[in-house]
């Protein structure tokens, strides 16, 4: 008889070994290389004793994939799917199945990273270029970015940009029309406070009465009204104000674009182009402006350049505007955006094309006209005289009956006040839905006939779009929007683009400080469940009890992980989390009469988002030096804290440091800052080396954001979505963000919002919930310990060939390490960019380049990579070192060798002539491990300078590809 127990056979911890890459035998061999006999021993060797904790997590025992999915399904069932007419920027939509299965559910799309290495990212770059073209066409403007986080934060970015470019330098006032979405006004007010802007909210028609640097209008407005805003825009611009217009892509298929009316900026939510509501997200915001403002535009911009063979190639353009380069002088702190969702929206436009989109918009508009005519026949007073898809109306005498019938029929109307209602129709609504809507408004015996109403609309009984606002201009005329309308062609187009990109489904992506770990299939499955996808964020709370339980449980787990006392799920990126955390710190200081505290200390090794976030809070950034070992220089820190004195607000510190070590003095850093009255903001970028081993709260931090798209398995999506919830100690809890429409328990009522929806991109919280449920407390600690093992194994093996720039106690690194390439450059003229491009020939994405130290690469393997994959990567770097040595020895010229010519493409090796001093095999199959499944870059090295000097951010003519 076997001594194995039933509990062992049930194997509840099976997922742990699925998530963690090295097998038990591989771990044993790797530990032997490091001279230790267990993960526990390595952890004690590596993590300072002052912060190392015994196993402490209370997140429960691990569950199998099946068990966790069943548990989450029971939570999901507590959400009620009702028919939403709420609108306000969120609409039910029909996701084309070819996009659902082949993009949203496809790891080739969702596990890629932000396209910093464009030669192996041409697919998603093309999809993003299509998104920009779509945005430019529909808004009527010259230039668009490749997505922002949501409509409300895009509005805040528009305000900040308006201040940068406005010629009315004397004014510090910004006007917001009172018919802008409520949640947008909320977020803009929050952002404006620490910029020192005066916000004026009033009727749109009064905008030009004020002396302002900028104005925000909504078109169509919150009530659905269509106004011709051309004259108002002109009046504002005559007074040197910049005009930003929040708009709706679906309406712009039928109504005159704001760009044609003179708007300087147009933005909004692209959600209704084939992305589920998801109780608030994730969705891609669009943002367009005029060419003259291009250097002030926030977010990523995709541009057309050329490669070394002169062929068109795409890249992220004008990166010098961004936080990772300009730091506190950046246009925005945006890092992660919403690439996956922008790509879905762009594919939606490609699949339907201009005719299909126009047909969808016409159907929505026709149903709205039918409803409006039916209401008028019933004597209902409409507030708006013109509309696209939204009606606001008054039914004071029957309000209670309307609400009761709506609830019984499962309909959610927008309640705009006592007896005032609003309805917004969308792509998913049908004539049957209109029948139900009439029944809710007027009872079963309403006597309205949809076909009769339709014939009257067709006969001209309704003029809902004024003649001067009917769209006359064309859009989406580029061939890409007119070729892929059968599913066969669309499927092949998506696959063609996917094949151009390297993602985690092909090989390790060892980007330091980015934590490109496994995004398990079981974690992804619930994202597409309708119980999570089809809820409007402003639906009645009783319909979202599943979401409330999801958020509550996940918050409890993350509080346990971080050692904090409260958690906010509202920030929808790490950068937004930083901003929300600094906001809580400043509000806390103000509550104690210390509003003068405005100095933020930031180590020189910090991520670029840190100083960019601090400047958004109008803080003065003071840089703290690091010593020769890569640690914060305690003498310099003390001197600068002393100098700041009573003006010290906080320090922003990353732990483990971005130099890849656990700093021994981290508790001393926290104590010193606290002694000077400051708060400690611990950047959560490197939490993957803390979970279950130590915690920010235990170390002494007051607030942190968590990158759920790093540590807790939300995929990077090629540049988003992400989530950046913040944890805080109790004294900061009341200063967490709240929401103007849906009040959140805990934070003070009236606290401003930092995102459009109360729980940010709520639908992807399911991914992190699944990860923690399946790993349990034991698995989470093992993941951190294995991340430490993999990094130290890499460092040990590579140290025989390269200098590992920084090490901590016992000569260990944390979960990542920095490899010094400067000697290679000195000897052979081979720079880190050459190593990065050459790695593509070996089938790898480059590690992080020149951060935090120029001339280096930072490698983070994560716990999900096997020993075999680590060995393959080690072999690639060692081989590249040998190639550089040949250059140094003069065997290959410095200007003509496999490194400076990398990456190599099929076009290179099929050239009739080959005039290089190395053979084709060396170029493309440099080691045996580059096998039959080799990844081929589809373009050669891209000319960055040419791309920025000849900025082109729209789809190039197809002839340019010939």
UniProtKB/Swiss-Prot annotation:
Q: Give the source species.
A: Idiomarina loihiensis (strain ATCC BAA-735 / DSM 15497 / L2-TR)
Q: Which cellular component terms (GO) are annotated to the entry?
A: cytosol; glycine cleavage complex
Q: Would you tell me the protein name for this molecule?
A: Glycine dehydrogenase (decarboxylating)
**Family classification:** Belongs to the GcvP family.
Q: Which cofactor does it need?
A: pyridoxal 5'-phosphate
Residues annotated as carrying N6-(pyridoxal phosphate)lysine in the record are: 710
Instruction: Specify one Pfam family.
Output: GDC-P
Q: Which UniProt keywords apply?
A: Oxidoreductase, Pyridoxal phosphate
EC assignment: the record states: 1.4.4.2
Q: What class of enzyme is it?
A: oxidoreductase
**The keyword Oxidoreductase belongs to this UniProt entry's keyword annotation:** yes
Q: Name one GO biological process term.
A: glycine decarboxylation via glycine cleavage system
């Amino acid at each position: 008889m076997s001594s194995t127990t039933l509990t062992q056979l049930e194997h509840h911890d099976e997922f742990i070994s699925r998530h963690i890459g090295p097998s038990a035998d591989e771990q044993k061999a790797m530990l032997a290389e490091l001279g230790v006999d267990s993960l526990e021993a390595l952890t004690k060797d590596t993590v300072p004793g002052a912060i190392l904790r015994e196993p402490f997590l209370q997140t429960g025992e691990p569950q199998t994939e099946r068990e966790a999915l069943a548990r989450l399904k029971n939570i999901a069932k507590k959400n009620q799917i009702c028919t939403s007419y709420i609108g306000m920027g969120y609409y039910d939509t029909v996701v084309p199945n070819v996009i659902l299965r082949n993009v949203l559910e496809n790891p080739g799309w969702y596990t890629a990273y932000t396209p910093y290495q464009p030669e192996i990212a041409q697919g998603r770059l093309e999809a993003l270029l299509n998104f920009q073209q779509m945005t430019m066409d529909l808004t009527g403007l010259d230039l668009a970015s490749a997505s922002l986080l949501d409509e409300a934060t895009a509005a805040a970015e528009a305000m900040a940009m308006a201040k940068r470019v406005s010629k009315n330098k004397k004014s510090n006032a910004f006007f917001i029309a009172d018919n802008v979405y409520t949640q947008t006004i909320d977020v803009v007010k929050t952002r404006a406070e620490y910029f020192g802007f005066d916000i004026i909210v009033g009727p749109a028609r009064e905008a030009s009465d004020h002396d302002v640097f900028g104005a925000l209008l909504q078109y169509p407005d919150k009530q659905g009204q269509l106004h011709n805003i051309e004259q108002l825009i002109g009046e504002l611009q005559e007074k040197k104000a910049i005009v930003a217009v929040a708009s709706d892509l679906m309406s712009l298929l039928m109504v005159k674009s704001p760009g044609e009316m003179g708007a300087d900026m147009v933005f909004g939510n692209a959600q209704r182009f084939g992305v589920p509501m998801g109780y608030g997200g994730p969705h891609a915001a669009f943002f367009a402006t005029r060419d003259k403002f291009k250097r002030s535009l926030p977010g990523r911009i995709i541009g057309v350049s050329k490669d070394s063979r002169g062929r068109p190639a795409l890249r992220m353009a004008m990166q010098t505007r961004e936080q990772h380069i300009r730091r506190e002088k950046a246009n925005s702190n945006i890092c992660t955006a919403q690439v996956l969702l922008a790509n879905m929206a762009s594919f939606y436009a490609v699949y339907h094309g201009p005719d299909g989109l126009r047909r969808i918009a016409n159907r929505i508009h026709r149903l709205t006209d039918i409803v409006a005519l039916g209401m008028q026949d019933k004597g209902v007073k409409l507030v708006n005289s013109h509309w696209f898809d939204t009606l606001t109306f008054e039914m004071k005498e029957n309000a209670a009956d309307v609400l009761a019938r709506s609830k019984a029929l499962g309909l959610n109307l927008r309640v705009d006040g006592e007896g005032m209602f609003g309805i917004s129709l969308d792509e998913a609504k049908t004539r049957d839905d209109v029948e139900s809507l009439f029944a809710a408004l007027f009872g079963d015996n309403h006597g309205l006939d949809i076909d009769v109403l339709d014939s009257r609309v067709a006969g001209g009984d309704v003029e809902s779009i004024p003649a001067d606002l009917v769209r006359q201009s064309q859009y989406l005329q580029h061939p890409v929007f007119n070729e892929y309308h059968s599913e066969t062609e669309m499927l092949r187009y998506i696959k063609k683009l996917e094949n151009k990109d390297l993602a985690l489904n092909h090989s390790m992506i060892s980007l330091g400080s980015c934590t490109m770990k496994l995004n398990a299939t079981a974690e992804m499955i619930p994202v597409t469940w309708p119980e999570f996808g089809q809820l409007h964020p402003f639906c009645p709370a009783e319909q979202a009890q599943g979401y409330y339980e999801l958020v509550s449980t996940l918050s409890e787990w993350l509080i346990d992980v971080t050692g904090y006392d409260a958690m906010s799920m509202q920030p929808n990126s790490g950068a937004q989390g930083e901003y929300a955390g600094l906001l809580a710190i400043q509000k806390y200081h103000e509550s104690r009469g210390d509003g003068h505290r405005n100095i933020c200390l930031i180590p020189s090794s910090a991520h670029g988002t840190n100083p960019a976030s601090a400047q958004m809070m109008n803080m003065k950034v003071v840089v703290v030096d690091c010593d020769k070992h890569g640690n914060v220089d305690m003498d310099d820190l003390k001197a600068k804290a002393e100098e700041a004195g009573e003006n010290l607000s906080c320090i922003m510190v990353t732990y483990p440091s971005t130099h890849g070590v656990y700093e021994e003095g981290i508790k001393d850093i926290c104590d010193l800052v606290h002694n000077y009255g400051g708060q400690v903001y611990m950047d959560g970028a490197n939490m993957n080396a803390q979970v279950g081993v130590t915690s920010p709260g235990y170390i002494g931090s007051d607030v942190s954001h968590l990158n759920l798209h790093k540590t807790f398995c939300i995929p990077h999506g090629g540049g988003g979505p992400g989530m950046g919830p913040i944890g805080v100690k109790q004294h900061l809890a009341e200063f967490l963000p709240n929401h103007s429409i849906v009040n959140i328990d805990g934070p003070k009522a009236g606290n401003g919002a930092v995102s459009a929806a109360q729980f940010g991109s709520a639908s992807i919280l399911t991914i992190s919930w699944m990860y923690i449920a399946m790993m349990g407390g034991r698995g989470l600690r093992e993941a951190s310990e294995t991340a430490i093992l993999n990094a130290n194994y890499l460092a040990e093996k590579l140290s025989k060939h390269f200098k590992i720039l920084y090490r901590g106690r016992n000569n260990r690194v944390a979960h990542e390490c920095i490899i010094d390439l400067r000697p290679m450059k000195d000897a052979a003229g081979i720079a880190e960019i050459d190593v990065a491009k050459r790695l593509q020939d070996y089938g790898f994405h480059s590690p992080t380049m020149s951060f935090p130290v120029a001339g280096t690469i930072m490698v983070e393997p994560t716990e999900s990579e096997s020993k075999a994959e680590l060995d393959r990567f080690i072999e690639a770097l060692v081989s590249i070192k040998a190639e550089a040595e040949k250059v140094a020895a003069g065997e290959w010229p410095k200007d003509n060798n496999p490194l400076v010519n990398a990456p190599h493409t099929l076009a290179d090796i099929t050239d009739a002539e080959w005039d290089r001093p190395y053979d084709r095999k060396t170029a493309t199959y440099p080691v045996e491990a580059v096998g039959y499944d080799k990844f081929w870059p589809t373009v050669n090295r891209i000319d960055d300078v040419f791309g920025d000097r000849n900025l082109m951010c729209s789809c190039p003519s197809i002839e340019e590809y010939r």
